[in-house]
């Protein structure tokens, strides 16, 4: 049968492309990571250096475990800082309550020597749920699904793919040759190459199946208050609470408004309240010390004043109680003054709480869903006599986030200022990572200065494999910290949005740093763009076949080994946090300040960064599980150790976080990128080794294209589903559900304050105990008591949704 003209043209173009890339029948293995001649770094060694790297990494892991055990037992309760943190920081899930606190202490004492090690295996999900919240349970459930997936992948890769690769005879017969275990060992005319593509498709379906099972297990207990509260942006800054309430009453007469809260800028007030709280704790500390010892303590409150050995001008000592009393009075004056100016700083935001969830859903649908009439689609909400005054057509309406998810101090940063700040931070971040994205640039620089020439004859695997993979892990560990702090500077309105953006950015940068650029043999994004766009560059024809060099897979196997042992060991030790902790303890001016540092050292678990880092390694494992099946069991070891370390850290180290479920679904979507990249790798192999017209290449291309189209369709429908009214399920009001529903009426609405301000509110207002226990959005209830009869409930940092900021 004659070939079609389309395939003839396709084949000619493919041959032309392969000729431009300088590809022959076999890959050119004279270069991979460095194009410099006679490079002494990253050259092939016995079995890719894997045995040596494994031995060194396991030894380092045991050493890190020993160091952590000593530090945890001897210094500052460092290994369980979440348990010694102040109770106010943990009130979100009633941590350190009378029951759970005593239970925790019994648990610690019961385990005896090295309790943290056995606690990893003895902890139950119920304990983690009570102590750490729902998000920790979903995160650990995600890891367990990844573990089961990698068990299946490891079994198939070792029992099917590895024997197939070993059956080839293209490379040396040396049993110590790592290349014999890779797909590069098979001849191009070997029909067994079809098996690799079929198993890549199987891995894709397995990943989809396991991830779907995980998403079905994600069950969030929606807060009644959250689901019946709407967050509104785009309000005129001079809008009044009564006007907004009248608008909803007139436009939606069937929807009963419980409360309307306007949002004001309280960022400075929150900061002052935090400082006042620290000062009060220090004052209490020295007051109790005086009662106990009968003597007043002298301190030197100047920076590094504790290191002054004598009293000189500018370094005088003073009474601790007098100093902190004076600081407290000064802060109270500033808080009182700031409260008086709060209402002069409106944010143009509000949140409205309704009697029923169905009412909030109905209004959200009216504002967001496109309603088509004839040939026109419009989204104008129902009008009222106040619509023009309130500019309702410019409103952005979303469901409100949980109050614990709000970054209260960031609400004042919005509109053009927010976008300019975001662009500036990310442009600077991109420039910084543009020229330094993989440690290969350091290795090539070492070659230029002949640093490694003396060991050229040794061909030592410690130099050629251990240090490069250690450098790669070090850079991949540093990058999340850089992206983390840059994301904090972006001033997101919710912690969920902050974590989701962080996860996306870290994952993309890590995939480029760890997988794509090293696979292509590129040293940085600078070279990547030059290779991509500069057709006259000498590097433009020498990169793609680097993906399938025999020793290429060994580099990634060693990286996964380093991540499994050194990475998880360092994550348990948390060396950057330990250094910061030590620095803060040294710089604390007084013993009371050091006590405050110790109690405020615990932070919330950054699910976004941790998801991204774990998914990066998972993507490397799956992407090379076909071309280099040896990587799969080491990947399983990595995720098992990661799971145990995270169980320990979530329970003993980090404070619980209250996030939206969107971040867990985003992690599932990113996990699906792993088998897609595996298909990409097989397609590149088929294209470079077999040609475009080969049946295996065409089949892989069609599967890959279909997968990408399905993912794009899913993403697009997910992005635009709010335009369809069918996606807003309206529940029946309680009055239509009978007496059974009436028994579950929502509790009465009572204003609520941000956590840091709640203590002041309870101290200075006459709120009843029942009122203090109920949660709502945004209010500051006459904290200072300086404005008699006036409630500053409107001067609130309102609840926000995890939506992008509007100008």
From Swiss-Prot:
Outcome of substituting residue 567 to S: In HLD19; loss of mechanosensitive ion channel activity
Transmembrane segments: 52-74, 135-167, 192-217, 417-444, 463-490, 496-532, 555-586, 607-624, 629-651, 662-689, 695-709
PTM description: N-Glycosylated.
Lipid bilayer topology: Multi-pass membrane protein
Catalytic activity: Ca(2+)(in) = Ca(2+)(out)
Signal sequence interval, chain numbering: none
Region (Gating helix): 555-586
InterPro entries the UniProt entry points to: Csc1-like, CSC1/OSCA1-like_7TM, CSC1/OSCA1-like_cyt, Csc1/OSCA1-like_N, Nucleotide-bd_a/b_plait_sf, RBD_domain_sf
GO molecular function: calcium-activated cation channel activity; mechanosensitive monoatomic ion channel activity; nucleic acid binding; osmolarity-sensing monoatomic cation channel activity
Outcome reported for the amino acid change (mutating residue 553 to D): In HLD19; uncertain significance
Gene3D superfamilies per the UniProt record, alphabetical: 3.30.70.330
Ranges per topology, Extracellular: 1-51, 168-191, 445-462, 533-554, 625-628, 690-694
Cytoplasmic side: 75-134, 218-416, 491-495, 587-606, 652-661, 710-807
Sequence similarity: Belongs to the CSC1 (TC 1.A.17) family.
Function (record text): Mechanosensitive cation channel with low conductance and high activation threshold. In contrast to TMEM63B, does not show phospholipid scramblase activity. Acts as a regulator of lysosomal morphology by mediating lysosomal mechanosensitivity. Important for the baby's first breath and respiration throughout life. Upon lung inflation conducts cation currents in alveolar type 1 and 2 cells triggering lamellar body exocytosis and surfactant secretion into airspace. Also acts as an osmosensitive cation channel preferentially activated by hypotonic stress.
Disease link: Leukodystrophy, hypomyelinating, 19, transient infantile: An autosomal dominant disorder characterized by marked hypomyelination on brain imaging, congenital nystagmus, and motor delay manifesting in early infancy. Both neurologic impairment and abnormal brain imaging spontaneously resolve during childhood.
Name recorded for this polypeptide: Mechanosensitive cation channel TMEM63A
Organism in which the protein naturally occurs: Homo sapiens (Human)
The encoding gene: TMEM63A
């Amino acid at each position: 049968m004659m070939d079609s003209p389309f395939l003839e043209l396709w084949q000619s173009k493919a041959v032309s492309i392969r000729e431009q890339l300088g590809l022959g029948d076999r890959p050119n293995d004279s270069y991979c990571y460095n194009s410099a001649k006679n490079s002494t770094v990253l050259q092939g060694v016995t079995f890719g250096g894997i045995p040596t790297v494994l031995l060194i990494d396991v030894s380092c892991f045991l050493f890190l475990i020993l160091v952590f055990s000593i530090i945890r037992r001897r210094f500052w309760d460092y290994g369980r800082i979440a348990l010694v943190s102040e109770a106010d920081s943990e009130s979100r899930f009633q941590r350190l309550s009378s029951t759970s606190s005593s239970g925790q202490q019994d648990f610690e004492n019961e385990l005896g020597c090295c309790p943290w090690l056995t606690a990893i295996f003895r902890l139950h999900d119920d304990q983690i749920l009570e102590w750490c919240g729902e998000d920790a349970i979903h995160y650990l459930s995600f890891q367990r699904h990844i573990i089961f997936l990698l068990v299946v992948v490891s079994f198939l890769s070792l029992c099917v793919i590895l024997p197939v690769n070993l059956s080839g005879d293209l490379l040396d017969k040396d049993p110590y040759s790592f290349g014999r275990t890779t797909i590069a060992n098979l001849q191009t005319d070997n029909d067994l190459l079809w098996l690799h593509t079929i198993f890549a498709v199987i891995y894709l379906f397995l990943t989809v199946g396991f991830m779907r099972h995980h998403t079905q297990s994600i069950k969030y207990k929606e807060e009644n208050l959250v689901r019946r509260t709407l967050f509104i942006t785009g309000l005129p800054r001079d809008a009044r609470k009564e006007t907004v309430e009248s608008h909803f009453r007139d436009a939606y007469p069937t929807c009963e408004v419980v409360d309307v809260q306007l949002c004001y800028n309280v960022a400075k007030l929150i900061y002052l309240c935090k400082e006042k709280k620290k000062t009060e704790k220090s004052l209490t500390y020295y007051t109790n010390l005086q009662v106990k010892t009968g003597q007043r303590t002298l301190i030197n409150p100047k920076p590094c004043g504790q290191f002054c050995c004598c009293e000189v001008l500018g370094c005088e000592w003073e009474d601790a109680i007098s100093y902190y009393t004076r600081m407290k009075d000064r802060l109270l004056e500033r808080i009182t003054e700031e409260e008086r100016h709060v209402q002069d700083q409106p944010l143009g935001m509000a949140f409205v709480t309704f009697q029923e969830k169905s009412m909030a859903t109905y209004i959200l649908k009216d504002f967001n869903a496109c309603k088509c009439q004839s040939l026109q689609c419009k989204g104008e909400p129902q009008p009222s006599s106040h619509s023009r005054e309130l500019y309702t057509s410019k409103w952005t309406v979303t469901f409100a986030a949980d109050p614990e998810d709000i970054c209260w101090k960031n609400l004042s940063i919005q509109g053009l200022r927010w976008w300019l700040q975001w662009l500036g931070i990310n442009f600077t971040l991109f420039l910084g990572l543009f020229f330094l994205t993989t440690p290969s640039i350091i290795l090539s620089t070492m070659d230029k200065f002949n640093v490694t020439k003396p060991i050229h004859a040794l061909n030592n695997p410690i130099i050629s494999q251990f240090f490069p993979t250690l450098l790669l892990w070090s850079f991949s560990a540093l990058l999340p910290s850089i992206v983390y702090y840059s994301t904090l500077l972006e001033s997101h309105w919710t912690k969920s949005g902050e974590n989701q953006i962080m996860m996306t950015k870290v994952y993309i940068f890590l995939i480029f740093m760890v997988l794509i650029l090293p696979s292509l043999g590129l040293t940085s994004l600078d070279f990547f763009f030059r290779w991509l766009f500069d057709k006259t560059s000498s590097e433009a024809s020498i990169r793609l076949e680097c993906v399938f060099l025999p020793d290429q897979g060994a580099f990634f196997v060693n990286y996964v080994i380093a991540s499994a042992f050194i990475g998880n060991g360092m994550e348990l030790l948390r060396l950057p946090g330990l250094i910061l902790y030590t620095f803060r303890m040294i710089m604390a001016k007084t013993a009371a300040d050091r006590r405050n540092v110790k109690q405020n050292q615990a932070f919330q678990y950054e699910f976004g960064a941790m998801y991204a880092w774990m998914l990066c390694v998972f993507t490397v494992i799956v992407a090379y599980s076909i071309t280099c099946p040896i990587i799969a069991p080491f990947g399983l070891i990595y995720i098992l150790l990661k799971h145990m370390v995270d169980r320990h850290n979530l329970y003993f180290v980090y404070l619980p976080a209250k996030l939206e479920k969107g971040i867990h679904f985003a992690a599932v979507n990113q996990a699906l990128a792993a088998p897609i990249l595996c298909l990409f790798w097989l397609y590149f192999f088929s294209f470079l080794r077999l040609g475009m017209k080969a049946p295996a290449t065409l089949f892989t291309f069609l599967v890959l294209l279909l997968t990408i189209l399905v993912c794009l369709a899913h993403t697009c429908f997910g992005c635009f589903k709010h335009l369809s009214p069918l996606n807003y399920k309206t529940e029946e009001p309680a009055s239509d559900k009978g007496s059974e529903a009436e028994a579950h009426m929502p509790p009465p609405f009572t204003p609520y304050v941000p956590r840091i301000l709640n203590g002041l509110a309870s101290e200075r207002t006459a709120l009843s105990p029942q009122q203090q226990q109920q949660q709502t959005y945004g209010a500051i209830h006459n904290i200072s008591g300086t404005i008699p009869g006036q409630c500053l409930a409107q001067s609130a940092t309102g609840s926000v949704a995890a939506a992008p900021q509007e100008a």
